[in-house]
Amino acid sequence: MKKTLTAIALLLAAGSAHADDKVTIEFAYPYSHLFDVTYEKILPAFYEKHPDIEVKMRATYESYEDAANTILREAVAGELPDVTMQGLNRQAILVDKGIARSLEPFIAEEADFAKDGYHQAMLDLGTFNDEVYGLPFAVSLPVGYYNMDLMAKAGITSTDQLPKTWDEVADVCVKLKDAGVRTPMIWGWNITGNWFLQALMWTQDKPIMAGNDFQLDTPEGLTALNTMKKLFRSCDMPNLELKGTLAGFAAGDFAMLYWSTSALGTVERTKADFDLRTHEFPGLTADGPIGLPAGGNAAVLVSDSDDPKVLKAAWTWLKYITSGEGAAEVARTTGYMPPNKAANEVVLADFYKQNPNKETAVRQLPLLREWQAYPGDNGLAVTQVLYDGTEGIVTGEYDDMQELQEELVEEVQDLLPSGS
């Protein structure tokens, strides 16, 4: 897929303008298995409108952590791309380090920026110190994926019977195991940025960070850990890698998958012959979560070029992919939601009615909360500490959740800046 995308970019760019007239910019993005098909759709339309710009694709990032680490290394080496796609929770570190460039000078030159769908709530996701540094490209939320053919083995045959709470999920797992389903459920604990741990915290309306205060030491934090333990034990959940998880569900091996809506396009394209339904993310009560963290990524200008032509070309590409027309391909090819208002209200007016599985996340939009980054220079290290601790629950290394809570809080607080 990656070779195909690069070939399309080069072929289209070469055929539409003389090489001497072209401005070449470099671009990097994460998750090739999700986004290659999206950029394959976007590039031809972009080149048709902008034949004087060539977009050179760099190797894709494996994750948002990889994306941030790669940019930090490239900044030191003087090898930055012009535009990078970064996790919404990883923009701040690039702003703090002076790597991301403010988009305010470019926005000021746009006559109809708001009319083009760039509303304030969208801009807020990429605003730091009262300036816009990133334009959100794709927004995701956690949802439930269900193989209804397998769910029928637990007596669940319609959407309104699907579990609404994690206790109900655990009960369904027991029924499915009794019915011979080997892997009843997979829960996305290992999705980038401790996203699902934050989801359990926001479910209780509790952010994981309050300033520099790590709030896993609260009753809500202990509830989050105990909820994961109950799910993993009740469902005999194996410890799978990310790509193996999606492949396994698409093959029909699991009855329930709790994951990002971002993977829906991939699952729909690759799934076996079974009835797939998505449904709202369960909560601790039947009322559902109070909030959920917004996942996704934003386009950030990190070019170290001083050439006005390069910077203008980079802005042209950055604006196009986040525009109504460009961002609409996000919804068509993935399960992400485009934050651009024009994409949702104009380009995709009837799309969600015709694609009910993709509408699930849209119904959860009122729950959107911040996907928090951990402050200071050790933010990525904090992510790893929590990843390791959660994996220990999956593997059975940790059984006493209060003891694990104390251990994680002590280790994380030592990595965070002091003061509120």
What are these regions (language model features)?
Residues 279, 332-388, 392:
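Long, aromatic- and glycine/proline-rich binding clefts that accommodate carbohydrate-like moieties
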Residues 88-141, 170-172, 196-199, 203, ...:
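Hinge/lid segment of periplasmic solute-binding proteins
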Residues 21-33, 53-60, 83, 133, ...:
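Short, well-ordered beta-strand elements
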Residues 33-54, 386:
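Short, polar/charged alpha-helical segment
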Residues 128-137, 142, 152, 167-213, ...:
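Extracytoplasmic/periplasmic solute-binding protein
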Residues 21, 48-49, 54, 154, ...:
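Extracytoplasmic/periplasmic substrate-recognition and gating elements
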Residues 170-176, 211-239:
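Glycine-centered hinge/linker elements that transmit conformational signals in sensory
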Residues 45, 50-118, 127, 153-155, ...:
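Extracytoplasmic "Venus flytrap"/periplasmic binding protein-like
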